[in-house]
Amino acid sequence: MSVADIKKSAEQKMQKSIDAFKADLAKVRTGRAHTGLLDHVQVDYYGSMVPISQVANLGLADARTISVQPWEKKMVSAVERAIRDADLGLNPATMGEVIRVPMPPLTEERRKELTKVVKSEGEDAKVAVRNVRRDANEQFKKLVKDKAISEDDERRGQDEVQKLTDRFVAEVDKLVAEKDKEIMTV
């Protein structure tokens, strides 16, 4: 394994950490409606749990309402129950074959709680990125010990991985700041 391989592997792992963090951020409810909020909702479809997107069309009725239209009439109550049980603080209402999910406005207290959650998840993402850096540095040390690379190459590799770490940590900070702003905007 070369310095370039370790760097490439570290970059891919760091990107996966950022992608996972972005997915976590999408689940944090702001005052605005977006279909991504329901992405992780699982519906009981004839005995097996499937994502809501596989049994219904998701759309936006307006800025504060998600509309969910199950493909089968008999799935309406199961989809509504799944949304209610998803622990998102949402109260869906069925109108014929369409389920409307209004976004209740967030209280100031709830907004502050959500910003704490976002910051905590941001710290977790930074820790994940730093763990990748630590693993890469350990691989460099092992290569030096095995005399596969020189100490200069090790230092160069560690510097490059540190630059990657700085870049990804800055991206996490940027995402946290954007989400905080989105949450605190009334």
From Swiss-Prot:
Family per similarity comment: Belongs to the RRF family.
Pfam families noted in UniProt: RRF
Organism lineage: Bacteria, Pseudomonadati, Pseudomonadota, Betaproteobacteria, Burkholderiales
Record carries keyword Cytoplasm: yes
Role summary: Responsible for the release of ribosomes from messenger RNA at the termination of protein biosynthesis. May increase the efficiency of translation by recycling ribosomes from one round of translation to another.
Name of the protein described by the UniProt record: Ribosome-recycling factor
Alphabetical UniProt keywords: Cytoplasm, Protein biosynthesis
InterPro entries: Ribosome_recyc_fac (IPR002661), Ribosome_recyc_fac_dom (IPR023584), RRF_sf (IPR036191)
Subcellular location: Cytoplasm
Molecular functions (GO terms): ribosomal large subunit binding
Any one GO CC term of the record: cytosol
Biological process terms in GO annotation: cytoplasmic translational termination
